[in-house]
């Protein structure tokens, strides 16, 4: 089948989880050849949709059609650490048969296993090399590889099968800059139908179209992420104009209805006066009264219907406006004076991971990006600075109050409400003060009383961020470990907004260069056994 014939079709899908939570109802989607980026808020059903298309889940209603061999790279990989590379690639049996034939064993069974794949080892090594894995060979085990290498290996297995349809679910989450570059190259070279769920801006700039999943349906936008954002901004500006016009119409209809009531009341008083003074025959006045009542009723109904229609148009206009509120906070307690000493590192050796040579003194409100290949020790270093780990040797001396946002958002007590979680980190604040500040993080009213365990991914992130930033004492050194890994685009934007208000020093371990640039990084460091200065350009190139 040629690449131009590949496609995915979902017709009238309905899917709910066993607890009754509805994900899709009457859902339709068609994806043709080319690269499609699927975006949407955390929890809207993106990963569920990919699992439905892959056949891992079954819809309660509807039909899914896939033309072309299908490959699926899920967000979470479950690989046995004892598996060898050739087993993950699915070529171990053919390698064994090739070895047997080369050793002189010419039984028919070996030829049946090999089929036409006499060059399978060469093709496998070439595929690995194309993804930057040429160094691992075919006999290494999963347990000897990093998380990023495992993701690329699983992608290599899919590419080796030459599928016509490829599903990728947050493929860059655990990849370092070098591995991301290799994955971007694979996406650029793709010719079949590709559907990728991602919040990675660089990856989404490479797609041909954007499918925006929102409230159980998809809206299509031609072009990459930048084109989508431009089109959405135009749409939202038009929607806001429609709302303002509809609001104006509602107010006008209310005024006209009120004026009509006043006019009818005056006519009623005049008619009663005519009746009381008997200026005309009773029969004539009775006819006029009945006609006036009919006319008044019609007039009232007409204006009431016009008001109802105007209110309906307002509801429709408001439904087109996205309620993407911004985080607007002030954090004066986090201020660090220029030149003030914040952190001293000297040849730190964390209790796990590689040791690091070199010295670092953080002064003032520096914003430092911590980069390096997977396994270079970024997480171990941050945990050591935060006090979660004790250094085996060297000096690790935070000189100000420190806050740490780990990769896993396990800072919150799931059984406690959002407001109680924040109150625990700021024991000197009143309940009203905590609630007022939480509102700036978009937890207003009853939302602040929800148990942390019931929050969506984006909500949980905001609550965790609030717990850290609203702490007493306020953190004047903030450590973030891959903060954008599990966030949708809206949550990444809100993190950026919150960090705009942060006035302390910042150390961020991340491979997400666009995010790092958006938060105003002032110094780029690379870990490779030493603490080395680098540049954004070098990090973007995978260096």
PLM feature segments, named:
Residues 82-87, 216-241, 527-543:
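Conserved beta-strand-loop-alpha-helix hinge in the C-terminal portion
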Residues 10-13, 20-34, 62, 345-364, ...:
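Conserved beta-strand
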Residues 79-147, 407-477, 482:
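ABC-family P-loop ATPase nucleotide-binding domains
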Residues 200-206, 227, 410-411, 513-518:
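Conserved H-loop
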Residues 35-36, 48-109, 364-432, 511, ...:
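ABC ATPase nucleotide-binding domain signature region
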Residues 166-170, 175, 405, 477-482, ...:
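Catalytic Walker B motif of ABC-type/P-loop ATPase nucleotide-binding domains
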Residues 155, 183, 465:
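Hydrophobic anchor residue at the start of the ABC signature
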Residues 1-16, 94-151, 234-352:
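Coupling and communication elements adjacent to P-loop NTPase active sites across diverse families
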């Amino acid at each position: 089948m040629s690449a131009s014939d590949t496609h995915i079709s979902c017709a009238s899908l309905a899917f709910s989880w066993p607890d009754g939570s509805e994900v899709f109802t009457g859902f339709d989607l068609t994806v043709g050849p080319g690269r499609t980026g699927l975006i949407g808020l955390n929890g809207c059903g993106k990963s569920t949709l990919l699992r439905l298309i892959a056949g891992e889940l079954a819809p309660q209603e509807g039909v899914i059609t896939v033309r072309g061999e299908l490959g699926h790279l899920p967000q979470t990989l479950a690989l046995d650490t004892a598996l060898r590379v050739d087993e993950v690639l699915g070529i171990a049996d053919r390698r064994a048969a090739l070895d047997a034939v080369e050793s002189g064993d010419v039984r028919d069974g070996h030829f049946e296993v090999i089929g036409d794949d006499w060059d399978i080892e060469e093709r496998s090594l070439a595929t690995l090399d194309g993804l930057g894995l040429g160094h691992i060979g075919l006999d290494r085990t999963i347990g000897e590889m990093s998380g990023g290498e495992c993701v690329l290996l699983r992608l290599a297995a899919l590419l080796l099968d030459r599928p016509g349809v490829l599903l990728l679910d947050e493929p860059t989450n655990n990849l370092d800059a070098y591995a991301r570059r290799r994955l971007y190259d694979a996406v650029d070279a793709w010719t079949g139908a590709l559907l990728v769920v991602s919040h990675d801006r660089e990856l989404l700039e490479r797609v041909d179209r954007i499918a925006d999943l929102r409230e159980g349906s998809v809206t299509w936008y031609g072009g990459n992420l930048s084109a989508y954002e431009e089109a959405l901004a135009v749409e939202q500006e038009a929607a806001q104009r429609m709302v303002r016009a509809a609001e104006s119409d509602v107010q006008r209809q209310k005024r006209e209805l009120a004026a009509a009531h006043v006019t009818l009341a005056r006519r009623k008083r005049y008619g009663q006066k005519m009746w009381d003074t008997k200026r005309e025959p009773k029969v004539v006045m009775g006819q006029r009264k009945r006609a006036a009542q009919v006319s008044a009723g019609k007039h009232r109904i007409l204006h009431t219907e016009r008001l109802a229609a105007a209110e309906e148009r307002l509801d429709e206009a408001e439904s087109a406006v996205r309620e993407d509120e911004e985080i607007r906070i002030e954090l004066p307690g986090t201020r660090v004076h220029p030149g003030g000493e914040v952190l001293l590192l000297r040849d730190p050796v964390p209790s796990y991971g590689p040791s690091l040579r070199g010295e670092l003194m953080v002064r003032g409100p520096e914003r430092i990006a911590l980069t390096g290949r997977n396994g270079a020790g970024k997480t171990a270093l941050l945990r050591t600075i935060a006090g979660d780990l004790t250094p085996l040797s060297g000096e690790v001396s935070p000189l100000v109050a420190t806050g740490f946002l780990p990769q896993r958002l396990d800072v919150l007590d799931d059984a406690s409400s959002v407001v109680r979680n924040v109150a625990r980190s700021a024991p000197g604040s009143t309940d009203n003060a905590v609630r007022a500040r939480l509102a700036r993080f978009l937890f207003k009213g009853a939302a602040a009383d929800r148990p942390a365990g019931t929050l969506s991914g984006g909500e949980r992130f905001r609550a965790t961020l609030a717990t850290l930033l609203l702490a007493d004492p306020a953190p004047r050194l903030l450590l973030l470990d891959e903060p954008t890994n599990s966030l949708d685009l809206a949550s990444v934007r809100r993190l950026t907004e919150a960090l705009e208000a942060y006035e302390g020093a910042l150390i961020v371990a991340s491979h997400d260069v666009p995010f790092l640039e958006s938060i105003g990084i002032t110094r780029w460091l690379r870990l490779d056994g030493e603490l080395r200065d680098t540049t954004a350009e070098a990090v973007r190139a995978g260096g």
